[in-house]
Amino acid sequence: MTSDIAMQLIAILEKTVSPDKNELLSAKNFLEQAAASNLPEFLKALSEILVNTANSAVARMAAGLQLKNHLTSKDEKVSQQYQDRWHQFPSEIRELIKNNILAALGTENTRPSCAAQCVAYVAVIELPINRWPMLIQTLVNKVVSEGSSEMHRESALEAIGYICQDIRFGVMENQSNDVLTAIIHGMRKVEPSNHVRLAATTALHNSLEFTKSNFEKDMERNFIMEVVCEATQCQDSQICVAALQCLVKIMTLYYQYMEPYMAQALFPITLAAMKSDNDAVALQGIEFWSNVCDEEIDLAIESQEATDQGRAPQRVSKHYARGALQFLTPVLVEKLTKQDECDDEDTWSPAKAASVCLMVLATCCEDEIVPHVLPFIKENIESPNWRFRDAAVMTFGSVLNGLETNTLKPLVEQAMPTLIRLMYDSSVIVRDTIAWTFGRICDIIPEAAINETYLQTLLECFVKSLKSEPRVAANVCWAFIGLSDAAWEAAVTNDGETPETYALSPYFEYIITQLLETTDRSDGAQANLRCAAYQALMDMIKNSPLDCYLVVQRTTLVILERLNQVMQMETQINNHSDRHQFNDLQSLLCATLQSVLRKVHEQDAPQISDAIMTALLTMFNSSAGKSGVVQEEAFLAVSTLVELLGAQFAKYMPAFKDFLVMGLKNFQEYQVCCAAVGLTGDIFRALKDLMVPYSNEIMTVLINNLTEPTIHRTVKPQVLSAFGDIALSIGNHFLPYLSMVLDMLRVASNLQTDANNFDMNEYINELRESILEAYTGIIQGLKGVDQTAHTDVMHMEPHLMHIISFIKRIAQEGDVSDSMLASAAGFIGDLCTSFGPRLYPLLDDAIITQFLAEGKRSKAQRTKMLCTWAVKEIKKINTQVITQ
């Protein structure tokens, strides 16, 4: 790079912090053009500016930032593209950039180090493929060498921290000891620089997943714990907080090793942190004990599972939370009294953290928590100080989830009159907390909420509170959801039929009217009130008994009228905020429409279906219909209507088909695409061969979706399931697509699970279940409904060996879900009825026999039934083989 070009680039970089918008835009455009014209040379030039200490701090920082932004992205796909691009650079340019950014470490006078970030992001690309082998040792040397400057130690530790944060697990395994040596060296209390200690402590936090082998060795673990505990006592609050964060993470990762340190170090350190007036310190102290509780809740579940299976648990709880309970609860309830009147709902505070900690403590310690919190609640629930009233109510609401019903019910019933009275408290914060507590009561101990002694009084205060401040009204809406669920559960019988009446029937119409009014409040956007009110409305409708049906019908018409009114408002939208609210409202109305339609009686559906489809088609046709959220909810509303109308939906297909295809093609918004695919299956099942005229276009789009490389993987299982629905519905009309679909199913069925990739395994299992559903639909569709299988099913015979091998592979890999087992068993039964004795040699296999035997022992009724049926069908064809 010539000096003139370098000077020009430096000048441009310095303009990236200019207050002048024109200069900023000009600089942005120049840098984008430079990157587009020759990216390797551009990044090399940036690295040369970064390494040159004669350049201004602004230019160097901007160069580092530009360099970093061309190496990584928050979007995983883009980040992968950047990594692939880096590998294609000429090796001499890659090496020069690496040398420059490494040489720049410790030479900056700004924090954090841009060079450290650049080094880390190149390392994340290169270390997994064994390039830049000396990097880690070089960074370690910069930290531990006696002559190393403060800036060198700090920036090297920052680089190590960034690498540990982003590198793929396992890559650093052979160098974890060296990394840990450097980190612990930088954390020691003899280190004179707090900047270095902070960078080291942050790096430790990022590297803890890699230190498993070190924590397994007593001496190494003792040394690590000593250094971390020392760091928690540092006068620099940032170091103290970072060290506490390490303890929080250590407790989660290495719980089983913590017993030697708990009484003497961890307990006193974290209790003192909880009591701190520094919010950041207090939050970490509280977080530590929340994590302890989470861990011990999981261990209790594991222990119960082990007992049920007649084996010893792999890990056991040390019951630290129970042991600390009497010391923790006074600190936590005291933190609850420190809430700020102007607290932003999104700001995490010690008071909010204390509430969460009390919840998990109650879950962990159950009834043992009661004597430690009840005196505080009784003493303060009617305190003249609103903070103490609120803390008492918050404590009460927070511990409900862990208590046994026998303990909980009398406590709640005794508290009900006071709680109802507090719904009219002068403090909005107290009323908000009370409304939240009632929501929890309705959810956790519903029988207390619908107790006729208090029900009418409770409903009166709920309805009045719907007119309160948005935050209070929103919590009341969530309480209505719990109340609605409680009333329904109390009334519904074992057969699952809709009950004739329930506890809320006398008040139902009034509640619905008030909720509809709440959805229309001008301040409905605050505290998510409008959404909460519509959710409550949907839940009330969903859980309505037969004697409330007239109100449901009227509500359907109200929602339909609102949908039409809202669409007429579209011309009045002036800005992005209005558009966002408009789309949200349409999506809520579509969701509510689904809820009311599910309760509409089948014979009443044709009377309203024209009006509903007209409204939905108008919406699809409007610009709002292009919004992903609106499209998704609208497709789900159509799906509910299809379920109601059955084959009568056919008259809407000519007008609706193009919008359905538009949704199927919208794979960029995968939720919309999934909703459209699900709806496609629903329509085919309802209309059967009436869908044949549309099959070609729809199948073409679905097949294209499966071959589209950028489509979100969530869509693929849905498409495969849809193939099954389509094949089942149109029978031999599916034959033109059979070969291509079977090829796709074969490719999908060959995907292998990976023991180290939980997410991928979850996806593969979902895919496999969809494959089984597709095969089942195809077999049933081609077989026909007659007792004797139609000859069309013989098109599947060449594929039977692969299909049975696929089922055997599922069986051999183990850990099969009940739903997968049921799908496989049902499919095996269908194969038997379709192919008879000729199938027996493929099914006469110990793997299949064992697989179905396991299913017969399942606790899930459907799985048990289908596996039993499949075994009978196999025996039947075996008998036929013997008698032939």
UniProtKB/Swiss-Prot annotation:
Keyword Cytoplasm tagged: yes
Write down any Gene Ontology CC term: nucleus
What tissues contain this protein? Ubiquitously expressed in embryos.
- InterPro entries of this UniProt entry? ARM-like, ARM-type_fold, HEAT_type_2, Importin-beta_N, Importin_beta
Q: Its principal location? A: cytoplasm
Q: Which UniProt keywords apply?
A: Cytoplasm, Protein transport, Repeat, Transport
PROSITE patterns, alphabetized: HEAT_REPEAT, IMPORTIN_B_NT
| Database matches in SUPFAM superfamilies | ARM repeat
Region spans: Ran-GTP binding:
340-425
Importin N-terminal domain mapped to chain residues = 27-107
Q: Name one Pfam family in it.
A: HEAT_EZ
Q: Where in the cell is it found?
A: Cytoplasm
Q: Does the keyword Cell inner membrane apply?
A: no
**Function according to Swiss-Prot or TrEMBL:** Required for nuclear protein import and mediates docking of import substrate to distinct nucleoporins. In Drosophila, may not function as a snRNP import receptor as it does not interact with components of the snRNP complex such as snRNP U1, U2, U4/U6 and Snup.
Q: What family does this belong to?
A: Belongs to the importin beta family. Importin beta-1 subfamily.
Q: What is this protein called?
A: Importin subunit beta
What organism is recorded for this protein? Drosophila melanogaster
Q: What is the lineage of its organism?
A: Eukaryota, Metazoa, Ecdysozoa, Arthropoda, Hexapoda
